[in-house]
């Protein structure tokens, strides 16, 4: 959530910064509410000061010998009581305006970092680096073709069980998925991340705190009889691990590696990636999450990105890193580095991780602060996929496919799978 003080004091500057995202932003309604709130605040403060003055005058008169039940003191007390009633009315009006102001603020995205590349769409993203040599050969299969041939998952029966965009992993496919999850968690925890397995059902406050609500309600699955939603990413529950808390500065950064199933309606993606593991309603992901000191979030962003890259390097999967432009970063992000893995069968780079620094945007929505001495300030939050498991499996299958129909696994996965290859069953 944006800082209401900044919005109130510098609305034009805020509108300009939000406009860098590629869409004009009208802050008129927000300004009107903020001005009304400021006016009420000043009026209330003035009345409270007058009430305090009258209270002191009553005390002085009684101390000077005036009759506590006399007419003069009674008149002053009557004035004081009238002021208290006015203050109570103003406080209620302020609460109402504060609710309106917060509802408005929750609809605005984060301000892009000054270092975020300017751009109008994804074509303006800036490639920073590449790792590995992409495999480029004629006749390579896409991952879903390999999976069907090796019977790694069953989509037809999954439609019967649920609907389209679901898969049931079978045999070697289920084992490979489990191996990837365990490998990712082991790698991250070896680097000091604390493993977390959070609830997959979260309440509205959690989704609001991380930035999914109110804007992305249509892309989430909701339990209609309860205030619960299926989490679209472990970022949501992990953000709320420390909601309404003050974290001592000497405990920062807090670094979590969270595995969870993720659920998304994928509204607006009709017709895209209809086969395989790339775009599903339910998928597994290992999420990296940092609560960092505000002075060190830039270094934390570089590190969380490197930690996500380490998974791809260990699995010998070529990839590239993109610095997303202002029009392509997510709602809660200040700046985002996307990792795109090479899929030899599809002959394309595909997103497998987004590593974002969110500044104090989520922390303000979730009231997560840190204390250093007597000073209390909002923490900074960062998140990144480490990695999306299904897309990682797709890359492993396409990269390791052999002419005999088998799939040669990365050496790092062999101890987890228990075999060097996936063979036709």
Curated annotation (Swiss-Prot):
The keyword Nucleotide-binding applies. SUPFAM superfamilies: Class II aaRS and biotin synthetases (SSF55681), tRNA-binding arm (SSF46589). ATP binds at residues 264-266, 351-354. It is an enzyme of class 6 (ligase). The keyword Nucleotide-binding applies. GO terms for cellular component: cytoplasm. InterPro entries: aa-tRNA-synt_IIb, aa-tRNA-synth_II, aa-tRNA-synth_II/BPL/LPL, Ser-tRNA-ligase_type_1, Ser-tRNA-synth_1_N, SerRS_1_N_sf, SerRS_core, tRNA-bd_arm. Pathway: Aminoacyl-tRNA biosynthesis; selenocysteinyl-tRNA(Sec) biosynthesis; L-seryl-tRNA(Sec) from L-serine and tRNA(Sec): step 1/1. Consists of two distinct domains, a catalytic core and a N-terminal extension that is involved in tRNA binding. Catalyzes the attachment of serine to tRNA(Ser). Is also able to aminoacylate tRNA(Sec) with serine, to form the misacylated tRNA L-seryl-tRNA(Sec), which will be further converted into selenocysteinyl-tRNA(Sec). This is Serine--tRNA ligase. It comes from Parasynechococcus marenigrum (strain WH8102).
